[in-house]
Amino acid sequence: ALNILLIIVDDLRPSLGCYGDKLVRSPNIDQLASHSLLFQNAFAQQAVCAPSRVSFLTGRRPDTTRLYDFNSYWRVHAGNFSTIPQYFKENGYVTMSVGKVFHPGITSNHTDDSPYSWSFPPYHPSSEKYENTKTCRGPDGELHANLLCPVDVVDVPEGTLPDKQSTEQAIQLLEKMKTSASPFFLAVGYHKPHIPFRYPKEFQKLYPLENITLAPDSEVPDGLPPVAYNPWMDIRQREDVQALNISVPYGPIPVEFQRKIRQSYFASVSYLDTQVGRLLSALDDLQLANSTIVAFTSDHGWALGEHGEWAKYSNFDVATHVPLMFYVPGRTASLPEAGEKLFPYLDPFDSASELMEPGRQSMDLVELVSLFPTLAGLAGLQVPPRCPVPSFHVELCREGKNLLKHFRFRDLEEDPYLPGNPRELIAYSQYPRPADFPQWNSDKPSLKDIKIMGYSIRTIDYRYTVWVGFNPDEFLANFSDIHAGELYFVDSDPLQDHNMYNDSQGGDLFQLLMP
């Protein structure tokens, strides 16, 4: 049986060389992409950590997990739904969790869903507890809890950072599993580029400020309904941002500071890339690259000033569009010859790392909720059946698609752009709001405060969103109570700045809104 290495990154938008970003240096992830099938149009089902992770790890949508906030455990609150690692464990795999896989806290029962999901207790890096403490040296020489936090690693508590510790632990587990009779499922969850941007300061050198531009559409668009806007409260709480005294809810953040946020996000991505590089290089050294599927994705994107917005918490592409790629030995790339390395470590500071061509790509719209059936299918396990509606009583079923057909190539020289009919495909996302206007809890409303749900569909041609009344006691959306709508056409308005909703009463689109 093939092993699985699932790499989940926190808050990573597709700002990667393999997704066409010319600025960001991500040679190791690009190298993985060159041996993988990469999905150009993959979307998360809700752009916030806990709901997205519970959704894709169970293969069910947020309306089924009933988790839109950070305050409940799906097995108690919605249904006893199986997870990806649980399914692999029940099929004879040793399942292991390193770093941030499930969102910690009540949403995974304070145990990362143990013992259901994991063969032994999940690993959390000891230095994680300093992530939000005052460890950033400010211009005044004092330590602060800042948003921008490039550090000298020898100076920080424990002399290390969480993602470095997670990589080391994951490599140790791979060494252990090399001789194991059972196949393994190893999930590795990286923290960066999640805020605060606490990363080794040398990565800043890759992105001189004079090379950093603002978002091409850094103003709040005229036609944006206020309910669609997220006021990025989490950023405002950091000491360096507080000091700027930015007006609520729309800002803007001063231009110079916008550049610095973008610089630190990209630097965090390059730091993350080195950790992924070390992990994949170890997989190679242990001769596991010919027997291990590698899946790489993120829980959602992150706005970097587009539409005058920052962070996640919205239905825009910048918040919902994620990287998604699968390396399948012998299928997406030829098996490595003896002694050949598929994943030699690449140094982002080495200017010789040429931009690599991605391997195979699919332009089809896909959803993170399809990760479960796809990993099961690639590993040769039985693919869980489609869920009935409703499916609260069904423990094992899938609301996503099995993407296996994308991996059926006759030979490796075939056209790397896979044919499909993208016109038929839809990716669904949603986001709750407590009010029609942005307020202190608009980014992360608690279930009891949700008054409006924004249901959004993304096709190859458009993104269409309606914000409708929502009753949190009954978990019921009222589609006749429309608070606002958005419609953006991808070809003419790729950045989603010109809301065409009022011009085109989207009646025919309406029946598409429910998966």
Regions found by a protein language model. Give the residues of each.
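Formylglycine-dependent sulfatase
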Residues: 1-479, 494-512
